[in-house]
Each structure stands twice: as C-alpha cells, then as structure tokens.
Amino acid sequence: MIEWSDRGIVLAARPHGEDGVIVSLLSAGHGRHSGIVRGGRGKRLRAALQPGSLVQATWKARLEDHLGSLVVELLAGVAGGLLDDRDRLAALAAACALAETVLPERAPQADVYDATLALLDALAEGGEGTPLVWAGAFVRWEIGLLAALGFGLDLSCCAVSGECGDLAYVSPRSGRAVGREAGAPWQARLLALPAFLLSPAEVPANAQAVGDGLRLSGYFLEGHVLAPQGRGLPASRQRFVERLRRWSAADR
C-alpha cells in the first residue's frame, strides 16, 4: 500500500458512483493529484470539496499508477466568503479550472502551489473597493503559471533595442518585451504590456491594464500550452474575462 499526507487546494470534484466524488487537488508536495473521496456527495464534506478549499489530504493506493482514494479534512474555505461577489467567485472558478487544465498530473509544483495560495488570499481579502488589487494578482498568477510550465515571458529588456526602460509591448512570437519606441511601427502586431506587471509596487493596475494583462497571459496559455494538445482555455476563464470587460466599459 502506498500512502502520503499533504496539504492541498481543491481544484475540481465530479460525482463517481453512488456517493463518491473524484477530487483533483493541487497539493504542496505532490502536484496535481486525483483520488476518490468516499461519501464525498454528503453534506459533511460539501464545504471541503468546493473549488479553492484548502484541505489536509491523505491519499492511498495499492499501486502508484492507481487512482487511489482520498480522505480530506477542511482547513480553510474560500468560496463561501465570495458568494456575495460574483466577480471574485468567477476569478476563483477560473483559477481552479485553469490549474486543473494545464498542470501535468503528479508533477510537484511547489511554486505554483504557493502562488495559488497567495492568489486565494488576495481573493479572500479583496472586498468592495479593492477589485483591481486581486484582479492584478490574478494576472500575475497566470504569468507565473506560464513560467512554471516552461513558457515564461522575458520582460526584462527590449528584444529589439536591448534597452530596459519604457517597455510597452510583448512579441507574440518570442514572448519577449519590446520598447515603446522600437515597437511603434509594429504596434498592431504586438501584445500590450501593462506597466503593473513590471512594477507592481509602484504602478497600480487599472481596468484597461488588467484587460491587457489577461489578453497577454491568455494568448500564450492558449497558443503555447493548450493548442498543441488540441484544447482551449476553460469556459470559466472566458466567463471571468467577460465580467471584467464590464469594468473597462464602465471606465469609458
């Protein structure tokens, strides 16, 4: 019998059999990992199996490549505190679905786990009046996810001139930053680089910048990570993006 215990973030749960649930976790030390939770459709475990819940999990299986079983205990829930804020709830659903879609199974992803915990904290703390803080955190989380998957963007210096100031674009081909002046002739072909990704402590995000950031990360997630596998971005992420477009419209 193989067994491990670890903390994990619930990414998804789907019914299995009469009362069971197949749960997908992003665990601290074992990466994205799935298992069957017996009785998972009952009221006792309902809160623990909501996407975004932090749980203590014990996984057991006879062989390493078996699906195995999971026993989970709720440590902290996030979704319940977001029920009155559909934007943050949409962000939570998008993050969990995206991690479930793009992360390889059973590959340790300690940095992604830590970054996802930080995102959940930002969502939990980001009530009315601070939406752009957590929305900016979501964009930075997606950029970090790209890096963890081997498709990190190089936002250090201009790919054309080599200068490291006034960066305004990203090349869709190379994923490298391009300066404002150097990129001006090809502006229509380049992706906008929001300034808050370069200096988050100095430049606050606004609605337009968040939208640009989501287009930037979404372009590379879809084109470089998912398209080669014949897949697209999760529908929940698209719904989240649509919700945030209302912010930009309200700012006009």
From Swiss-Prot:
The keyword Lyase does not apply. InterPro entries: ARFGAP/RecO (IPR037278), DNA_rep/recomb_RecO_N (IPR022572), NA-bd_OB-fold (IPR012340), RecO (IPR003717), RecO_C (IPR042242). Pfam families: RecO_C, RecO_N. GO terms for cellular component: bacterial nucleoid. Keywords: DNA damage, DNA recombination, DNA repair. Coiled coil: none annotated. One of its GO terms (biological process) is DNA recombination. NCBIfam families: reco (TIGR00613). Involved in DNA repair and RecF pathway recombination. Belongs to the RecO family. This is DNA repair protein RecO. It comes from Rhodospirillum rubrum (strain ATCC 11170 / ATH 1.1.1 / DSM 467 / LMG 4362 / NCIMB 8255 / S1). The gene is recO.
